[in-house]
């Protein structure tokens, strides 16, 4: 396993990029710790797969360097980087047995057959494949085949990093949680450096200790799932993570105080005066909004049941504000007042956190 460092990295598919929009991956510096579980999260086309292919050696970056531990591997081809990659669609040898699929990478490296057998059976047991080792891979379900793809990455003890590119795309929804749980369990037991690429926040937040959120080729925030949820550095992160997403409200800054609809709003950190002409917004998640005796006057529009909570949609003038209300909590019949938890309310200028 390895510590992965990306230094001054940029990539464009154009020979002579002339503007910022020509860069598929905009300038970034990232580091993933040795043995860590990480996720690259963002919408389709944001640069996730490009970045993954640069790390694996399938692409050479236009600018910058890729380091595995203290070694610059930027110029190394993929087959010399000791990486394993699991793709969206399971890549297996259908005519081979499950056993031979798992053994294939080891036999290619000339490992003695006794050692091959020991390692294959060890990994098969971890993946719950030991009962089907002699079956042909062609007869397995999609999740079974994806386990083989994963196993071929894990079976090699010299792998620096295992990378997953949307690995649950073709898996039935009711089986996804089982594979997610298995991946997490495997990481906790093996402590191999893993990078998981997905557009699904649930997959990213339940698997990774560190999540990198990308949008439009740019890293907008990197941190733990808790950090991304409680203090989004950009309104995109607030929208993209959470269900429902963060409330983003038009704001002004008057007398040194952020305001919504002319009403003062306390925020987590006393903000500096934002740049002149900046678009100002207040961000607060529905989890940190509550009804109170006073505050922002609103009208209740609709209530939707969501398990232990109800999602309440309210309106102040033309602005919609959502909050979560517990099952046993009383709701105003029509009109009420909203209060924001100061510790989780932020001011944003042109999308970026201002405090």
Where are these regions (language model features)?
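Conserved ABC transporter NBD signature motif
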Residues: 64-72
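Non-catalytic connector elements of ABC transporters
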Residues: 244, 256-355
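Conserved hydrophobic segment flanking the Walker A/P-loop of ABC-type ATPase nucleotide-binding domains
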Residues: 25, 31-32
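The feature captures the beta-strand-to-loop junction immediately N-terminal to the Walker
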Residues: 41-43
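Helix-to-loop junction immediately C-terminal to a conserved catalytic motif
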Residues: 56
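Short beta-strand immediately N-terminal to the Walker A/P-loop
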Residues: 38-39, 85
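ABC ATPase nucleotide-binding domains
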Residues: 82, 92-234
């Amino acid at each position: 396993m390895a510590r992965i460092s990306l230094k001054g990295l940029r990539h464009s598919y154009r020979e002579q990029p002339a503007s910022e929009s020509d860069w598929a991956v905009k300038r970034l510096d990232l580091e993933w710790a040795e043995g860590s579980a990480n996720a690259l999260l963002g919408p389709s086309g944001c640069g996730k797969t490009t970045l993954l292919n640069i790390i694996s050696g399938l692409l050479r970056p236009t600018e910058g360097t890729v380091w595995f531990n203290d070694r610059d591997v930027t110029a190394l081809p993929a087959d010399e980087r000791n990486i394993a990659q699991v793709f969206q669609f399971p890549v297996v040898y259908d005519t081979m047995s499950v056993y031979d699929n798992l053994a294939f990478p080891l036999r290619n490296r000339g490992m003695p057959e006794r050692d091959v057998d020991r390692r294959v059976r060890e990994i098969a047991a971890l993946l719950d494949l030991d009962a089907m080792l002699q079956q042909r891979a062609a007869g397995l379900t999609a999740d079974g085949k994806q386990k083989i793809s994963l196993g071929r990455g894990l079976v090699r003890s010299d792998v620096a990093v295992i990378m997953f590119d949307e690995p649950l795309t073709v898996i039935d929804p009711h089986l996804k949680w089982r594979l997610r749980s298995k991946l997490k369990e495997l990481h906790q037991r093996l402590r191999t450096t893993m990078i998981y690429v997905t557009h699904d926040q649930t997959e990213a937040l339940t698997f990774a200790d560190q999540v990198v959120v990308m949008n439009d080729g740019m890293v907008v925030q990197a941190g733990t799932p808790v950090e991304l949820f409680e203090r989004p550095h950009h309104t995109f992160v607030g929208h993209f993570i959470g269900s429902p997403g963060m409330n983003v409200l038009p704001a002004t800054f008057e007398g040194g105080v952020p305001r919504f609809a002319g009403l003062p709003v306390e925020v987590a950190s006393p903000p500096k005066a934002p740049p002149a002409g900046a678009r100002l917004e207040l961000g607060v998640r529905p989890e940190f909004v509550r009804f109170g005796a006073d505050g922002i006057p609103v009208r209740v529009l609709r209530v939707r049941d969501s398990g232990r909570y109800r999602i309440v949609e309210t309106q102040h003038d033309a602005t919609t504000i959502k909050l979560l209300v517990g099952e046993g909590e009383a709701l105003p019949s029509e009109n009420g007042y909203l209060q924001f938890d100061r510790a989780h309310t932020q001011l944003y200028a042109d999308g970026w956190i201002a405090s």
